[in-house]
Amino acid sequence: MIIYRDCISQDEMFSDIYKITEVANGLCLEVEGKMVSRKEGEIDDALIGGNASAEGPEGDGTEATVITGVDIVMNHHLQETSFTKESYKKYIKDYMKSIKARLEETKPERVKPFMTGAAEQVKHILGNFKNYQFFVGENMNPDGMVGLLDFREDGVTPYMIFFKDGLEMEKC
């Protein structure tokens, strides 16, 4: 499995269990999720590869709290945050500077394509600003990456957008 981490906060943003597509000429990764419902405190056996206990039926007849949300957000403990258009412009300007500095050190050949593509992508984001929900990593680092959540035209299928150059891949 590959875990994609925010290169600034080191927070886990998503993994390769989802359908991942490069968009915006390879500048961003679009990660498709789905809406799920879970009992609070319950861990999906599919995520850990485990089996239900053979010791007998679970539960003691109490009602469980059911939480419904996007699997990417729930599985990776992403935290919702909010922005006005102006506050997002300020955030994204500072974030782009951080990524540019990182690229200058690690991948200088990516600086120009990143800066050109990022300007276009930010225009697109601002043009569709009202459609997005914003999520940061578990540690809620204000300098870290903000993932954008939107829904496909069907209104049911959620997807998130992340800047590819702001991510590190870690094999587990």
UniProtKB/Swiss-Prot annotation:
Q: Which domain of life is it from?
A: Eukaryota
The main location class comes to: secreted
GO cellular component terms, alphabetically, are: cytoplasm; extracellular region
Gene3D superfamilies tied to this protein: Metal Binding Protein, Guanine Nucleotide Exchange Factor, Chain A (2.170.150.10)
Q: One Pfam family from the UniProt entry? A: TCTP
Tissue distribution is:
Expressed by the venom gland.
Q: Does the keyword Cell membrane apply?
A: no
Domain TCTP: residue ranges: 1-172
Protein's cellular compartments: Secreted
The role this protein plays is: Venom protein that causes edema, enhances vascular permeability and is likely related to the inflammatory activity of the venom.
Alphabetically list the UniProt keywords.
Secreted
Q: What organism does the record attribute this protein to? A: Crotalus adamanteus (Eastern diamondback rattlesnake)
Q: Which residues form a coiled coil?
A: none
Any other noteworthy remark?
A: Secretion of this protein from cells may proceed via an ER/Golgi-independent pathway, probably mediated by secreted vesicles called exosomes.
Give this protein's Gene Ontology molecular function annotations.
calcium ion binding
- Note the SUPFAM superfamilies from the entry: Mss4-like (SSF51316)
Protein name (record): Translationally-controlled tumor protein homolog
Q: Which family does it belong to?
A: Belongs to the TCTP family.
